[in-house]
């Protein structure tokens, strides 16, 4: 079990295909409603939306997976609006931990040990592949 300490924010980072996206604290204050508005009005420019706050504990992994499951439709809706397809990936960043959760659009959940990680969309998910310029350091399925 991976343990996190202190307050951790989950951030959804939506990839728009440019080289301008990155993960930063400025993305941590956007509400779900604001994210929907951004997706509608700036579909190709959205970089990140605030997703949730967790008071961390030893079972934070279960809380994260429950969150992903319960918000799956919202996540896919935003991805489809931003990218025009359901085939992209979204990064769940946990800034204070140095770990991230990666969810492919088909619902597969991965945990990664670097913050800026996107898995290449192929059947192998090979470690060391480059995806949109971000190096995939390591990742493995958790569901």
Indicate where each model-derived feature is located:
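Low-complexity, glycine/serine/proline-rich disordered segments
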Residues: 1-34
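Functional cores of ribonucleases/endoribonucleases
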Residues: 20-21, 28-143
């Amino acid at each position: 079990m991976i343990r996190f300490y202190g307050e951790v924010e989950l951030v959804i980072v939506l990839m728009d295909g440019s080289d301008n996206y990155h993960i930063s604290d400025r993305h941590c204050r956007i509400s779900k409603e604001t994210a929907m508005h951004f997706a509608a009005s700036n579909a190709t420019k959205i970089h990140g939306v605030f997703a949730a706050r967790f008071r961390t504990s030893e079972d934070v992994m279960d809380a994260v997976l429950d969150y992903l499951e319960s918000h799956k439709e919202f996540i896919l809706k935003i991805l489809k609006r931003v990218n025009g397809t359901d085939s992209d990936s979204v990064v769940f960043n946990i800034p204070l931990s140095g770990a991230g959760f990666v969810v492919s659009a088909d619902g597969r959940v991965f945990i990664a040990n670097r913050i800026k990680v996107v898995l290449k969309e192929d059947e192998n998910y090979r470690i060391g592949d480059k995806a949109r310029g971000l190096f995939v350091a390591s990742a493995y399925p958790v569901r």
